[in-house]
Curated annotation (Swiss-Prot):
It comes from Francisella philomiragia subsp. philomiragia (strain ATCC 25017 / CCUG 19701 / FSC 153 / O#319-036). This is Small ribosomal subunit protein bS6. CDD domains: bS6. Keywords: Ribonucleoprotein, Ribosomal protein, RNA-binding, rRNA-binding. Belongs to the bacterial ribosomal protein bS6 family. One of its GO terms (biological process) is translation. One of its GO terms (cellular component) is cytosolic small ribosomal subunit. The gene is rpsF. One of its GO terms (molecular function) is structural constituent of ribosome. It holds the Pfam family Ribosomal_S6. InterPro entries: Ribosomal_bS6, Ribosomal_bS6_sf, Ribosomal_S6_plastid/chlpt, Transl_elong_EF1B/ribsomal_bS6.
């Protein structure tokens, strides 16, 4: 199995359905023995430029370990979900479990 980092930008009006959507994606990954090493909900953030006349989006980060078939199924689901504005899938050499820079920044702002 390979390691991947997945970043999703989700339509801000879909925040209520976010949990159901993410549990569906988790199910796809874990269905064939895949693992989620890190999950971060970055919340609603300002976009650098408007996408579909929107200025904000809900950001989510996954670091997963799964087979290629599961990844293709996940990407197919993401592709045809209108609530997903953008998606980025990056192949990684090993599992990443420590908090991302975005989460560290959020923790500093809270303190």
């Amino acid at each position: 199995m390979k390691h991947y980092e997945i970043v999703l930008m989700i339509h801000p009006d879909q925040s209520e359905q976010l949990d159901a959507m993410l549990s569906k994606y988790r199910g796809i990954i874990e269905e064939k023995g895949g693992k989620i090493h890190r999950f971060e909900d970055w919340g609603r953030r300002q976009l650098a430029y408007p996408i579909e006349k929107l200025h904000k989006a809900h950001y989510v980060l996954f670091n997963v370990e799964c087979d290629v078939e599961s990844l293709e199924k996940l990407q197919e689901n993401l592709k045809y979900n209108d609530a997903v504005l953008r998606r980025l899938v990056i192949s990684k050499k090993e599992a990443v479990t420590e908090p991302s820079i975005m989460m560290e920044t959020n923790e500093k702002e809270v303190i």
